[in-house]
Amino acid sequence: MAQANSRSRNSATISYPEKRRARVNLGKREVEILKTPYLLETQIESYRKFLQKDIAAEKREDNGLHAAFKSVFPITSYSGYAVLEYVGYSLGGESTLFDVEECKLRGLTYAAPLKVNMRLVIYDKEAPAGKKAIKDIKEQEVYMGEIPLMTETGSLVINGTERVVVSQLHRSPGVFFEHDKGKTHSSGKLLYSARVIPYRGSWLDFEFDPKDCLFVRIDRRRKLPATVILRALGYDTEQILDMFYKTNHFHLNQETVTLDLIPQRLRGELAVVEIKDKKGKVIVEANRRISARHIRLIEKAEINKLELPDDYLYGKVIGKTIIDKETGEIIAHANEEITAELLKNLRATKTASLDTLYINEIECGPYVSDTLRLDTTTNQLEALVEIYRIMRPGEPPTKEAAESLFENLFFSPERYSLSAVGRMKFNRRVGRKELTGLDVLSKEDIVDVLRVLVDIRDGKGDVDDIDHLGNRRIRSVGEMAENQFRVGLVRVERAVKDRLSLADVENLMPQDLVNAKPVSAAIKEFFGSSQLSQFMDQNNPLSEITHKRRVSALGPGGLTRERAGFEVRDVHVTHYGRVCPIETPEGPNIGLINSLAVFARANEYGFLETPYRKVVDRVVTDETEYLSAIEEGDYYIAQANTNVDGKGRLVDDLISCRYKGEFTLTTPDKINYMDVSPRQIVSVAAALIPFLEHDDANRALMGSNMQRQAVPTIRPETPLVGTGMERTVAVDSGVTVIAKRSGVIDSVDASRIVVRVDRKETEDDDDIGVDIYNLTKFTRSNQNTCINQHPIVEVGDKVQKGDVLADGPSTDIGELALGQNLLVAFMPWNGYNFEDSILISERLVEEDRFTTIHIQEFTCVARDTKLGPEEITSDIPNVGESALAKLDESGIVHIGAEVNAGDILVGKVTPKGETQLTPEEKLLRAIFGEKASDVKDTSLRVTPGITGTVIDVRIFTREGIKKDERTLEIEKAELSKVEKDLNDELRVREDALFENLEKLLTGRVAAGGPNKLAKGTKITKSYLADLPRQKWFEIRLQDDAATKRLEASHEHFKELRETRDAKLKDSRQKLTQGGDLAPGVIKIVKVYLAVKRRIQPGDKMAGRHGNKGVISTIVPIEDMPYLEDGTPVDIVLNPLGVPSRMNIGQVLETHLGWAAKGLGKKIGEMIEKGADAKELRNSLKPIYDLSKTQRFDLEALEDPEIVTLAKNLRKGVPISSPVFDGATEEEIKQLLKMADLPTSGQAALYDGRTGKKFDRSVTVGYMYMLKLNHLVDDKMHARSTGSYSLVTQQPLGGKAQFGGQRFGEMEVWALEAYGAAYTLQEMLTVKSDDVAGRTRMYKNIVDGDHRMDAGMPESFNVLVKEIRSLAIDIGLEND
């Protein structure tokens, strides 16, 4: 008994789906230290920070909307007497008008209204000067447009479609130093440059030219000497030299020159004179180059003065201006070169000493000094004017204009901002300790940038690597939306400033001042049409998740495809654990669009960081720390698969690790960190590929990209060989239904699950604890695939919080299931699998293994035209009865009708212009009053190539237009459905309430009540059963506390009913009110068709290892090769597809899949023999004991659960082989042995047609195959008479335009080569652009006369016209 208790107690810790079907984990590492983080965190967190919706106005942090408002407000009028201040904002009332589903149906944006509290302060103009007196304060809430909200799954619904805003990887603001790699100048000299990139504002570039002078550019304009900007900052020549150079001090006598010697500065120079020590011993001979050894000797000899000849001074540069003390005149300017003449002058004026700049080829070049000579400006004003001329060419400069322009460029918070990130990067790069500061530049900043740049030119320091992830940061949805919002606010600011300056501002309210249009327009434009706001890829749950985790280097403020070179696209060492090195598109975007790695996240500054386990004194701890690429370089980081003993100590003497971006071997005592998991470096899609470590990178890339194109099949099947990520993806993608609280399943049907919540989970006594989950049924996804959820729980099942209750598309018992497990044989088969073709068995079609449902949406819009309104009706001119058979009286197709290409879905007629009538027609009109002929048929028809079943019709009518029968019918049906749902919900909640009441009342002593309940009697269950439930509330109890609870329950009961009524009223109003349709639209009808697509030749299939192919033929089951026991294989692949592609993972997967299936078969046989739970438990134990880590605890399951588990394992025991930590060959062999299968993984096959055995054994096994969304039905296309191009009169191209096949230049050559003259003439005239000829030919065919007269092609006329446009008169001569 004790054992059973412990078992049931433990049972709760295993999740419900795992009890139903658990994977055998073949990973080697101990339990993951870090659970895979929530995969959509980046998106949701970023947008939450932007909205700060549920945070009180006072507590909001300085980012998102709040920051945008604070940066623009307060707005002051030009006079300064009126100020508009920002107080706070609120988002949406109680809830948004429509929920996500309704917004999708009605084509609306899921958004909340933004209301901003503003305060208008007016100052008294009559107040005495210097004192501001407030005259009036008005506060008001102003509506500022709608802000889109994010759905729970991280997407946005804009105009009825789900969109995703992709994060952008852009260059971080800050300062960067780089060189041109020797490309600019022919000599190959490296030209260094520095660039200050702000978050917003002007760019500032400093660069060297080939002559080593420094220049500055502002906003990529014409270059100026760099010292101009220093002068504009207020520095003079002496100060500039002082900042960049040390000086040498010389004493002048009439004959000699004496230098105050600093020995270090002599290094590398030629000794002009002998240098002797005090004893007269020569340390350095004349004309010898002075080395470091000489310098040590000079220092030892303590020589501090050195007499030198005059010519040593020639060419040296004066550091400080020299003034004649007697006359006050300047003898020599700072930065002047010393000549013999100047030296003579200095001696003549008895100058005793002078300072020269210490310039040395090795460590201190003459760059700034040379630049000063190029600089024509002499003072601050001239410098400002020079800058003004460059920025505003052609405008006359004034002192004020020049000053304000320069001030606004880099020093005004409105126009320039480095942002916190930029300031942090800037300070770190120029070597400051303090990482915070002003968002604008200061004088010191500009000087520091120049200093570092000069140092780099002198060989001290390195240039930056722009592709390092410490120099690129992530901009997510929230940040981009905030920037757009700010742009809108700045536009508003201008208008408000003008209005504040009006005379009657005192009579205005904040609402009259602010126009919300620019703000909502900016937001709308961003979410609707920005390059980074993309139509969500909704093929399957994986493609949704991947799309939300995508990181793009393109987009506004990013790179362009054409300009991006090889380096930006390449894998960088800092991508490790941050960005996936595998998953990126093939084609022009390769490397520019990446995917976040599994554990990566963005830090507060937007830099990607990845977690590591701390290692202290050789011992690996369980503590994890996130490091960004900047911090990571300073540590030794070991791999995840490093050998560790039981106590967590590092075992090996040398350990492979990463340090400063290099892979090295080092001793264990140096290790600081260790990876958290082997799959840390890859993205979600790549982490789903088993045996990824055995695949070539190119194929792995294709594999991870193709998984995203898999179409959800009707009966999803989880892979037999997975990686353990399947469950995480299915749960995080949001396609499944997850239990919010733990409890017991109360009722289940196809569209609703009701859970009675555990008592301990309910917050208060009022909470009766019922959770109702409504499932999504057969709705259309963005890619026209079908979204349908179905329950996996049964009544009475216990579920925990976070368990999966219902599967969605491509999920199977809470695990991702993109394809099907097929029995595959690697062998050629009559050439049908030549060049990657695939041969499949008819069984797959028969069992609907790859049948998919696609839902198409057709929309018909009736508009108001100039000639009158269009009408939706079944009365269509010139259309036979048969064509109208599927329409109802209102002209709309019935639900359930099967329609083919060309069938009418919605009948619509459009008024056509009155034509001139003949007298006879006029007479007929007058007699019969016939008006039918003045409308034309513009009905919505099924597009070519589609056959399907109508599954739903939606009608939206403009407010005030009479609704037709069908609309009322649909509304009535919807309303009754809603009412039923609400009543069911009420019933369930009331049942729970009365159940709780029964527990409360039973056994209590009554003080009276209905049905002559006497005082002092105990209340029994039978008494309550006889009493109508409503009357229970009339019972009076003696216990006060219980009475209070009874009263509270009564209140709760009333509340439930009121809530139901309010919801019903709300739904009724929503259903009956007309939609706000676009202007000029009267009615919109949407028809949904479900198309069932079986797999057929021409469809594209693929495995998970980049092994893709097209189905060449479908072979009857009896003709397929079969195994010795008679099992025919499902699919035959070409063995030649493996060696050159080097994706060996598929072979290992095949072997392991076969073992998994074999084990399942053995369990199935046991069940058929009637094995009981004990036997099943014993046979499952050795299988689950194969897990070295994360062992599944069979003991925790009760007997019925063991039986269910075994039944679910009959199709095969699912195995997980984690990425870079997967099953070894030995383990695969062991599993094959356990399944009684040959350990070679090969078996004898027999030819299905002859029954003969194939010569040698064939690799057979189970592989997971996907059907990709490249279906032959979507590509097949044939043109009859269709549309023509306007100018050339040639048929259009492409399936979408119902176009033809282009008969191009080369095809014409082919016919010419054959000499097929008539065919050629036909191709170039009547089949193309001979307008008269093709109409004649059509007529002839109708008349049964199959002749053609070729005429003049239209393209010839176009050519003639083009030549005429060159003013050459050219024309045809008619004979």
Swiss-Prot record:
The keyword Nucleotidyltransferase applies. It comes from Coxiella burnetii (strain RSA 331 / Henzerling II). It catalyses: RNA(n) + a ribonucleoside 5'-triphosphate = RNA(n+1) + diphosphate. The RNAP catalytic core consists of 2 alpha, 1 beta, 1 beta' and 1 omega subunit. When a sigma factor is associated with the core the holoenzyme is formed, which can initiate transcription. It is an enzyme of class 2 (transferase). This is DNA-directed RNA polymerase subunit beta. Pfam families: RNA_pol_Rpb2_1, RNA_pol_Rpb2_2, RNA_pol_Rpb2_3, RNA_pol_Rpb2_45, RNA_pol_Rpb2_6, RNA_pol_Rpb2_7. Transmembrane segments: none annotated. GO terms for biological process: DNA-templated transcription. Its EC number is 2.7.7.6. GO terms for cellular component: DNA-directed RNA polymerase complex. Keywords: DNA-directed RNA polymerase, Nucleotidyltransferase, Transcription, Transferase. DNA-dependent RNA polymerase catalyzes the transcription of DNA into RNA using the four ribonucleoside triphosphates as substrates. InterPro entries: DNA-dir_RNA_pol_bsu_ext_1_sf, DNA-dir_RNA_pol_bsu_external_1, DNA-dir_RNA_pol_su2, DNA-dir_RNAP_su2_dom, DNA-dir_RNAP_su2_hyb_sf, RNA_pol_bsu_bac, RNA_pol_bsu_CS, RNA_pol_bsu_protrusion. One of its GO terms (molecular function) is DNA-directed RNA polymerase activity. NCBIfam families: PRK00405.1, rpoB. Gene3D superfamilies: 2.40.50.100, 2.40.50.150, 3.90.1100.10, DNA-directed RNA polymerase, beta subunit, external 1 domain, DNA-directed RNA polymerase, subunit 2, domain 6, RNA polymerase alpha subunit dimerisation domain, RNA polymerase Rpb2, domain 2. PROSITE patterns: RNA_POL_BETA. Belongs to the RNA polymerase beta chain family.
